[in-house]
């Protein structure tokens, strides 16, 4: 029993009394409660809209070439610790990603096998890591690899088949060969699509725009976020600038990275990651989607030129909305020491180089790169 207006009213009649009473007090109460209800409803709608603006943020970590040593032509090209510690200095950063990407610059193949044509095996750049090295990738946090490059066929069909077998068994996703043009996978409720392209034999061709559009558009139709990787552009420090034209190197058509990236985004890509030039290049933003034109040499033990710009690289930390739009990011700078192996660079050389190249090559780009490595969007692009 409750007392209202000094009358005893049974609980069963309270609601009826409240709704039908004509007293001034009850009319005022109904007005106040109606106002509170409407205000609360508007607030909830506003909160719901705010949550849906970026309802879920995903973190992508991305690096360039990884080759942790080769047992060809012999085991002297492997590190003294058998590769165990090469990725440990950067594991904490790499493992932050919902998706952590790299370009696999070689194959996993312990045994002997056919090798690509070489006149002198001591000067032949053919890379095969022992089978158990795949565990080092898993331990570091990598779960997505491009195999579209000039080294995936170094040891013929046998080396390639062994590599994809080990990647499958380890749970690492991959794409880039004619046999494996794309892959989709799900993590934490987000469906990802991934495709990789190159100019090399047996890979999905970067310069075949019609086929690339078809693959990317298909992924866009079945995925929340589409990631595209390409192995293209001329190599070396002298070729680090974006020309916006077709790049020819060693008499090979290495594509037009600037044009390809925009074509990919127009077709449905949300993130475009480049590698191949072996040095860092500029970053870009197109239709709210992030582009990295070259991620450089990240972890390449022996047999690589690591002098100057060849020995520095970024770890990109990219925050995307669940629809793939770029929100914010950070450039973590690394350098390779000794025969190779990444460590954090306190001088932030990769950051400084990428910032400089972006400002020089893409002055219209609205990305803002801070001295601390943070990447934000300019007001023009946000609009």
Name each model feature, range by range.
Residues 2-4, 56:
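Residue-level detector of alpha-helix boundary/anchor positions
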């Amino acid at each position: 029993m409750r007392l209202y207006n000094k009358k005893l009213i049974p609980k069963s009649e309270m609601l009826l009394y409240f709704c039908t009473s004509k007293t001034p007090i009850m009319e005022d109460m109904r007005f106040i409660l109606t106002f509170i209800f409407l205000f609360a409803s508007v607030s909830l709608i506003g909160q719901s809209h705010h949550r849906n603006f970026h309802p879920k943020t995903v973190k992508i970590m991305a690096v360039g070439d990884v080759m942790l040593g080769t047992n060809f032509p012999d085991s002297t090209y492997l590190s003294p610790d058998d590769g165990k510690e090469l990725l440990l200095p950067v594991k904490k950063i790499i493992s932050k990603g919902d998706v952590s990407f790299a370009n696999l610059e070689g194959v996993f193949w312990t045994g002997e096998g056919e090798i690509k044509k070489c006149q002198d095996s001591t000067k032949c750049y053919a890379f095969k890591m022992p089978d158990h090295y795949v565990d080092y990738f898993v331990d570091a946090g990598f779960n997505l690899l491009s195999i579209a490059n000039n080294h995936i066929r170094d040891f013929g069909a046998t080396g390639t088949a062994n590599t994809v077998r080990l990647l499958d068994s380890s749970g690492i996703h991959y794409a880039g060969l004619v046999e494996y043009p794309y892959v989709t996978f799900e993590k934490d409720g987000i469906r990802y699509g991934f495709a990789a392209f190159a100019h090399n034999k047996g890979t999905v061709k970067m310069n075949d725009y019609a086929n690339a559009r078809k693959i990317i558009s298909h992924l866009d139709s079945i995925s929340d976020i589409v990631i595209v990787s390409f192995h293209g552009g001329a190599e070396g420090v002298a070729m680090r600038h974006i020309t916006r034209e077709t790049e020819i190197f060693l008499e090979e058509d290495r594509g037009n990275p600037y044009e390809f990236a925009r074509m990919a985004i127009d077709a449905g890509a949300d993130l475009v990651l480049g590698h191949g030039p072996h040095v860092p290049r500029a970053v870009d933003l197109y239709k709210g989607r992030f582009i990295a034109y070259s991620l450089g040499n990240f972890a390449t033990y022996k047999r690589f030129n690591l002098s100057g710009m060849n020995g520095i690289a970024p770890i990109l930390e990219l925050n995307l909305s669940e629809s793939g739009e770029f929100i914010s990011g950070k450039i973590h700078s690394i350098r390779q020491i000794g025969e190779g192996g990444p460590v954090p660079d306190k001088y932030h050389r990769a950051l400084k180089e990428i910032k400089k190249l972006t400002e020089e090559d893409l002055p219209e780009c609205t990305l803002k790169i801070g001295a601390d490595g943070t990447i934000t969007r300019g007001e023009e692009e946000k609009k």
